[in-house]
A protein has these predicted regions:
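Conserved RecA-like P-loop NTPase helicase motor core
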Residues: 181, 368, 393-394, 401, ...
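Conserved C-terminal RecA-like helicase domain
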Residues: 484-625
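Inter-Walker segment of RecA-like/P-loop motor cores
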Residues: 332-375
């Protein structure tokens, strides 16, 4: 039997691969410490800047000045510094010798990748010393680091194949938490983790998320997992330098680094090749796969081609407030890109003719306005004549909505030199679904833009876990193709409202303790208004299903949005309806929108539906169902949105897939599918869906649509049968912990399969129609008691812990692959959320204090047995959030002693006041420990974001004046210099936020 490979052997092979060939990485065995890395950096800096330095070496003081000025406090700031300007990173230096002129030092030159002044080196086992501030800290060694011009930019951590690659991931996170990536290592932008057989990469950040680990995919769509093959494909020169210089984006809002995925990079390269040949084309990337990010980098990178004067990201005017443009602006804030927010075409014309090679984001309408002004005025035409000679590249996101064939032809005719066009779409138009014939106008995407340059379909995105598949439920009863009137009757619409609320229990996640949102799309504004009233009437009458009221008493929170013209006489009725809808909305959310603020109202609806803003991440600030006609069915990104209800006839293939794609963003473990429910023409919908998926999913529905009920049921029964081998043999279950490893793996695999199958089948509404099914097709999900389930889970978790601890003795005689990082998908979904617990307590108070008051019978209140369960629910909730559960437990005990005391109080306010008091005490203590300003500390905590490496308000909090005051008051403090104090404050603030403030102030559901 061959000896197991060691990390040292893997490291040696990796370095051999990296240094193989000409112009690759050069091994530097002499660099083993941070001071040695700095010395090497300065040597390269001097070599590359002899002219600027006038051959006078840098003095120690000058080196100290430079290192202080360029060293940043976190990965994001360091990456921002390395972004430089015009693809070069420079640092100004005033020389110590006043007789020497100031130097403009070139640190990194991304215009000369694999040439010029670029120096590529690899080091390994660099020592990073422990902090003097922590007795528990220890020295560390980094496995392999790649340096460009002396700066560490890519860090590789290795584990041997008998350990999961996630151990390398966790090790890097541990080093980050220990501040080992400070100093010169803050320049790292890309992290690579591998166990030899599985390799992933991820952008550097203060808090790493395993969901963002990326597998490299080659041109043939095959994963590259083996670490030496990954090194050849990704870490060789020039590719590694391109990853840092060209395939990295800085998100200004989230203050984080983004690394592009393989398919995005391949699309950029395809466009780059086409543009060098003067060819146009389009990119077909599935909705939800990051088209905007890809198109942004395309727009930026095209400027590397000298023949292109400017690139223009072209949008339609009505898309200006869309998420696409907002995202583009956040990426552009750290780049040389001008986002056109000019009020008129005059300013745009000036920007076009200013001679700067940059990217403009503008609207088609403003460009057309320039043309018209030139046509109507010879003076203006002469002034802007040079615009006609520009060589432009147009980037068009959602390319069919932004530009029609007629509009594109008009733009082409204006310029003397044919512009290049690159369209991005998730739903290309083919011959099968071509536009209506109109003379010689382009009818397909290829005719309009040119050939497809890169393709990444829905099927690809689902396979890569970028988006979810779809679960289709055709509820319509009629198939009359010529009788739309049937679907406009009161009988049909009332039945649809009732059925929507019945289905919402599962489609919107309420059955599993979640609460996802939905869009409800109709064929007309009038129909949408009628549905809005029907939903409101149903809510007012208390006709929402009891099981929904039990878990979400205020479900559904409804809104409606549609376009209104102030000038059209026929829109008066629509305005009246919208006024009522605004009044309802203002009452529900305590807002004050008027008819003159419809734009703001629509944005607010979008924000509450998207739930990306911190303000809208609690249930009481969110919407459950938004009624629309066509609005929000394209270009809207809301990961929490799970369901699309359609009471309209089937749309064309491209619009159908666009609409469906609102539902299939990945959100959490409970969201298994994008749920689609149709209420009209079921046969036509089935045919339309098949046609759409044939066009957009590589010719079929496999892997894109959820399995039908019988398939999912069979999978559940098979998994249950495997688990029954243990349930029906208690002795086997009891002895599992001491059983051979092979038997333990078999149980773990069976338990994971059962959990997955159970989570999947809970999404089917057939579970609620079991009495309508033949006895042979019925299943019972309740025959495993909570006690037995807890026992099974306990055994499973113990076995997983044992397997992790005993990897060196792993039994390789079995092919059973156990996912040791598997997260329960169904078992833990039975947890009751805080909202439900508080509603039970609230209704208990109302019941106990009836004394002549009528209790609201439509709401749930604890029955005698349920009253006993409230304590159990609180204990269950404590597993996910003990700090908040502690306060709820105290209130519940107090309520039972004296319910009258709470008769005129909202228990939610009592809870928040109690939590606020504890939070204040925690912050007062933290402020006292470090001499911090309490108000500034409160501001930092209120705005803290773990994904943001530079929390808002932190720089003001750690001001030197507070350190000076602290040291004056505590002369014997361990913090004798400002930087030590500042670093410890940042660490403690993060720790207190993570372990105390966030759990206290965040409702876990």
């Amino acid at each position: 039997m061959a000896a197991a490979v060691t990390e040292a052997q893997m490291e040696k092979k990796l370095i051999e691969q990296l240094t193989q060939g000409a112009n690759q990485w050069r091994l530097r065995e002499d660099l083993k410490t941070i001071p040695q890395l700095w010395a090497n950096f300065f040597q390269i800096l001097e070599d590359n800047n002899r002219d600027q330095l006038h051959d006078v070496p840098l003095t120690p003081n000058e080196k100290e000045t430079i290192s202080t000025q360029i060293t940043q406090s976190n990965f994001y700031k360091a990456a921002k510094f390395l972004a430089g300007a015009n693809r070069q990173v420079r640092q100004h230096l005033k020389r110590d010798d006043s007789s020497l002129p100031d130097a403009d030092l070139l640190i990194l030159d991304n215009t000369n990748i694999a040439g010029g002044t670029s120096v590529y080196e690899v080091v390994h086992q660099v020592e990073v010393n422990k902090s003097s501030l922590s007795a528990l800290d220890q020295d560390r060694r980094f496995d392999v680091t790649l340096l460009i011009n002396g700066l560490p930019v890519i860090q590789i951590e290795l584990k041997t194949p008998n350990f999961p690659f996630m151990d390398a991931f966790r090790q890097i996170q541990k080093y980050i938490d220990e501040d080992k990536f400070g100093n010169i290592y803050n320049f790292v932008e890309m992290l690579v983790v591998t166990n030899g057989t599985d390799t992933r990469y991820i952008p550097a950040g203060s808090t790493l998320n395993a969901n963002f680990l990326i597998t490299w995919i080659d041109q043939n769509k095959q994963p590259v997992n083996e670490y030496l093959e990954f090194a050849r494909e990704v870490l060789s020169i020039p590719m590694a330098h391109h990853m840092i210089a060209d395939y990295t984006v800085l998100d200004d809002n989230a203050q984080r680094i983004i690394l592009l995925r393989p398919y995005q990079i391949q699309a950029i390269l395809a466009i780059f090749r086409a543009s060098r040949e003067g060819k146009s084309g389009f990119v077909w990337h599935a909705t939800g796969s990051g088209k905007t990010l890809t198109s942004y980098k395309v727009a930026r990178n095209l400027l590397q081609i000298p023949a292109i004067d400017k690139t223009i990201f072209l949008i339609d005017r009505k898309d200006l407030d869309m998420q696409t443009v907002t995202a583009f602006q956040t990426y552009a804030n750290n780049d040389t890109i001008d986002v056109d927010e000019t009020a008129n075409s005059f300013e745009l014309a000036q920007q076009l003719g200013d001679g700067n090679r940059n990217v403009l984001v503008t609207t088609r309408q403003k460009l057309q306005a320039i043309f018209k002004r030139m046509e109507n005025s010879p003076t203006i035409a002469k002034k802007y004549q040079k615009l006609k000679n520009l060589r432009l590249a147009f980037i068009v996101d959602e390319c069919h909505r932004a530009v029609t064939p007629t509009q594109k032809r008009e733009l082409d005719r204006f310029f003397n030199r044919q512009p290049l066009w690159y369209g991005f779409t998730g739903t290309p138009i083919f011959a099968e679904n071509a536009r209506a014939e109109k003379g010689q106008e382009a009818r397909t995407t290829e005719q309009l833009y040119g050939p497809v340059l890169h393709k990444y379909t829905i099927e690809d995105a689902i396979h890569d876990h970028k988006v979810l598949g779809f679960k289709i439920n055709n509820e319509g009863d009629f198939n009359q193709t010529d009788n739309d009137a049937i679907y406009l009757t009161d009988m049909h619409m009332k039945a649809v409202v009732q059925q929507t609320l019945l289905l919402a229990y599962r489609t919107q996640g309420l059955s599993n303790g979640h609460r996802y949102s939905a869009l409800f799309s109709t064929s007309s504004i009038k129909q949408a208004q009628k549905y809005y009233h029907l939903f409101q009437e149903t809510i007012a009458k208390g006709e929402v299903p009891k099981r929904i009221q039990k878990v979400a008493p205020d479900f559904p929170r409804i809104a409606i949005t549609y376009s209104i013209s102030q000038n059209e006489e026929e829109s008066m009725a629509n305005q009246a309806e919208m006024k009522q809808a605004l009044a309802d909305y203002n009452k529900m959310f305590h807002t004050q929108f008027s008819m003159s603020e419809l734009g703001s109202y629509n944005r607010n609806v979008n924000d509450r539906l998207a739930c990306k803003n911190k303000t809208y991440q609690t249930h009481d600030q969110q919407l459950d169902i938004v009624i629309v006609v066509d609005r929000l069915l394209t270009g809207f990104d809301a990961p929490r949105l799970s369901t699309l209800y359609l009471d309209r006839s089937p749309m064309n293939p491209q619009n159908l897939i666009q609409a469906f794609s609102r539902t299939n963003r990945i959100y959490d473990l409970g969201k298994k599918w994008g749920q689609i429910v149709t209420f009209q023409y079921p046969d036509q919908y089935s045919a339309a869906i098949d046609k759409a998926l044939t066009l957009y999913a590589n010719g079929g529905t496999n892997g894109v649509l959820a399995p039908d009920w019988n398939t999912s049921r069979q999978r559940y029964l098979q998994s249950r049968q495997q688990l029954d081998n243990y349930i029906k043999n208690p002795k086997v279950l009891e002895t599992l912990i001491d059983a051979p490893q092979k038997e333990q793996k078999q149980f773990a695999k069976a338990f994971q399969a059962y959990d997955q199958a159970l989570a999947a089948i809970k999404t089917y509404d057939e579970l609620d129609k079991q009495d309508q099914l033949p006895a042979a097709e019925q299943i019972n999900l309740e025959d495993i008691s909570p006690e037995l389930e807890s026992t099974l889970e306990g055994k499973y978790q113990t076995i997983i812990d044992k397997l992790k601890a005993d990897r060196k003795n792993d039994d390789k005689s079995t092919d059973l692959n156990i996912d040791e990082d598997y997260k329960m998908e169904s078992i833990h979904m039975k947890e009751v959320d805080e909202f439900y617990i508080m509603s039970l307590i609230r209704n208990y108070i109302a019941t106990a204090n009836q004394s002549g008051q009528q209790v609201n019978v439509t709401q749930e209140s604890p029955a005698p047995d349920e009253k006993l369960q409230v304590g159990d629910y609180i204990a269950q909730y404590a597993k996910t959030n003990e700090p908040r559960a502690k306060h709820i437990r105290f209130i519940w005990n107090d309520v039972q002693q004296d319910p009258q005391k709470y008769s005129h109080q909202r228990v939610e306010e009592v809870l928040e006041n109690s939590i606020k008091q504890e939070s204040q005490q925690v912050l007062i203590q933290l402020a006292d420990d470090f001499g911090l300003d309490y108000d500034k500390l409160q501001y930092v905590m209120d705005n803290y974001d773990l994904d943001n490496s530079n929390p808002k308000g932190m720089e003001n909090l750690v001001s030197r004046r507070y350190f000076d005051r602290f040291k004056e008051e505590h002369p014997n403090t361990q913090f004798q210099n400002f930087l030590d104090w500042k670093g410890q404050v940042r660490r403690q603030v993060k720790k207190v936020y993570e372990t105390q403030i966030r759990p206290l102030t965040t409702e876990i559901s």
